[in-house]
Amino acid sequence: MWLDGASQAAVERFRQSGGVGDDYPLDIERAVSLALPAVVVKQPRLELRGVEAWIAGRGAAFRFNCRSRSVRGCLVAYGGRGTIFVEAEDPEDERRFTVAHEAAHFMSDYLSLRERACAKFGPRIAEVFDGRRKPTLNERVGALLAGATLGVYTELLERDDAGAAGGAVYRIEDRADRIALALLAPPEVVLAEVDTSASAFAARRESVNRLLCERFGLPPQPADAYARSLLESTGRGASWVESLRLR
């Protein structure tokens, strides 16, 4: 399966809550506003200091624990709600993917964990997630709090891969990418529409890539990676000889 069970559940919940239909490219900003307790804010020349200023202008004090820099996207979540910031001057396809990526983080790395904890410990555990009190001993030993961000949750989508991470962080980012791609271009819809009968892998990959960009509005880089991953997941990836040529 291209998505793990939890990720697939998040995608299905989003589709049902947001009334996502069969029209593509998906209006992801509208879908987010319908499906999630989150808003999308577009800022030109998006920097962390600009995010801080936006939050301060609404009466809250918040600072990132790092220097200000330009980012493609940013998620700030607190109190069960999220704000997705996106670079307003990026091309439309890049903005679409950024919003979907940050929405994926909001669902899988923040909201889901919070909701599961509330279901297990009761609504008062939300005070712990929001950093308004320390967890009790019983709450502290609960596995749901392991690795959870208490207080304000933030996530940044950098403008390049210079700071590419490994290990657990890579897996989290990869999961967010997969959820984002499934929201914008559901694998079952893509595979039902594309012709993968070409004998050469390069031709099959180009066919999927073109559909992802033209029909679903994905930016070139994630579209290319998605095309290859989808083909491999359905047994239409590169042959052994072709894989040697791709290295």
Per-region residue spans from a language model:
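Active-site hotspot residues in diverse enzymes, especially metal/ion-binding acidic/histidine motifs
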Residues: 1-247
